[in-house]
Swiss-Prot record:
Induction: Induced by auxin. The keyword Magnesium does not apply. It comes from Arabidopsis thaliana (Mouse-ear cress). This is Transcription factor MAMYB. It is found in: Endoplasmic reticulum membrane; Nucleus. The gene is MAMYB.
């Protein structure tokens, strides 16, 4: 019987040819084939004749000249320029690439494995139901308690008391519209019990119009306006004359003009409900009459200024 040694294989396969074959093939490769040379030269001559006699346009003519030269020079070109042979086992043997930073790659692999393991553990924990329901409820209570404290520290607009509403009204009067940082200062008056958003919502619900109507000074001016006898006499004169409202012209006294100017100084343009306050400060005059009188005074001032210049 014949015994075969498995450690020593009989056939050895080589990816590259032996040195004797390579030397012979290199010599053959250096000598070009006559048939191949004749075919390439004939093709180059045909293309060259076509480029000179049949194609007069410039791009086609230049392309044909380039093709004819390539067919003529191609067989005599070295293999290093034309790419050499593409058969398996020919050419230079490539050296194996050197792997740098092996330690860094190992660390990256370990970190990826750890992250995958953590994700798998987290998914298994979420999938499994809790064993002790009481423990879960206790934990949820512990988590909910600080939230309830925080929510208690900052109340909503529903829990406002009458005293807090009065404080809000006073703060809104103290800090009028247009003042920088108005709502922050108003909210700070409550000692952190309400956020600025809740204060703004509550102020919108109440309405600044009602707040300003509750002012004692405004009420005094309105009562003075209603009880002014000059207003009653003026209405009687207008009704007796029977003229239209557009045709009649209101008469302003010096005291009313002074009161109007003082009101304009007291309530600047940035103040809320400016003209209502000005009309309340001038007895017997409406908002439209005050606005009209201001325009008349401006025109008179400009007309008196032009002749002086």
């Amino acid at each position: 019987m014949d015994f075969f040694d498995e450690d020593r294989p009989r056939f050895v396969f080589q990816s590259r040819p032996s040195s004797s074959h390579t030397a012979e093939e290199e010599e053959e490769a250096r000598i070009p084939n006559k048939l191949f040379i004749s075919i390439s030269v004939s093709i180059s001559l045909i293309i060259l004749s076509l480029s000179f006699f049949y194609f007069e346009s410039e791009p086609a003519k230049s392309l044909l000249l380039w093709l004819s030269l390539s067919f003529l020079v191609g067989p005599f070109a070295p293999s290093s320029l034309t790419g050499g042979k593409i058969r398996v086992g020919y050419g230079q043997i490539l050296e194996p690439e050197q792997i740098h930073d092996e330690s860094s790659t190992d660390n990256e692999r370990e970190s990826r494995r750890k992250s995958v393991n953590k994700r798998s553990k987290g998914s298994t924990k979420s999938d499994n139901p809790p064993e002790n329901a009481s423990a879960v409820t206790e934990v949820s209570r512990k988590v909910v308690i600080p939230q309830s404290k925080e929510s208690g520290s900052v109340n909503e607009t529903k829990d406002w008391t009458a005293e807090e509403i009065e404080i809000l009204k006073k703060q809104l009067i103290k800090h009028p519209a247009g003042k920088p940082g108005r709502w922050e200062t108003v909210a700070s008056a409550f000692g952190g019990r309400y956020k600025t958003e809740n204060v703004i919502k509550k102020a919108k619900e109440i309405g600044e119009k009602k707040i300003y109507e509750s002012d004692d000074y405004a009420q005094f001016l309105k009562n003075r306006k209603a009880s002014d006898p000059r207003l009653v006499d003026e209405n009687e004169e207008n009704s007796g004359a029977g003229g239209d409202a557009e045709g009649t012209k209101e008469i302003w006294s010096n005291g009313e003009d002074i009161a109007l100017l003082n009101a304009l100084k007291a309530f600047p343009k940035e103040a809320a409900m400016r003209w209502e306050k000005i009309a309340a400060a001038v007895p017997g005059k409406s908002k439209a009459a005050c606005m009209k009188r201001v325009t008349e005074l401006k025109k008179g001032f400009r007309s008196s200024k032009t002749p002086a210049n």
